[in-house]
Amino acid sequence: MFEVPLHFLIVHFPIALTVMAAVLDVRAFVAKRPEQHRMANVLVRWAAAGAALAMLTGLQLLGDRRQSSGATFHAASGLITGLVLIAVSMIRYSAEAREHESTRSTLEPWLVLEVFAALAVVVTALTGHRMVLEMMGK
């Protein structure tokens, strides 16, 4: 589409959604307002769906390129991030289904995983950005 690989069009959504969800959840945890987790929960679900698409399109691009250490590290980081986001989404959905999440304001395992995913998505974004700059010759 527009001679731009599909991966480049999809990948920005899970990056933004993951970082926004982590910020909202940490803010809700610090302020002891568990009801604020609802919006972050929705963002994490969409981020997980976007990450799954980004993983698929990224692996397709990796198959078309010669192996380079930067591309391999970026792919591994993206896969880890995507899988963690999917796990966070599933854990949060399970907690919501049990109505567990809205009654406690303790540090939940999914919050730790979500912050890890947000940091990993930033690392993945930076390595991807460097690869794009290299492809453009800058």
Regions found by a protein language model. Name each.
Residues 1-138:
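Polytopic transmembrane helical bundles with strong interfacial aromatic enrichment
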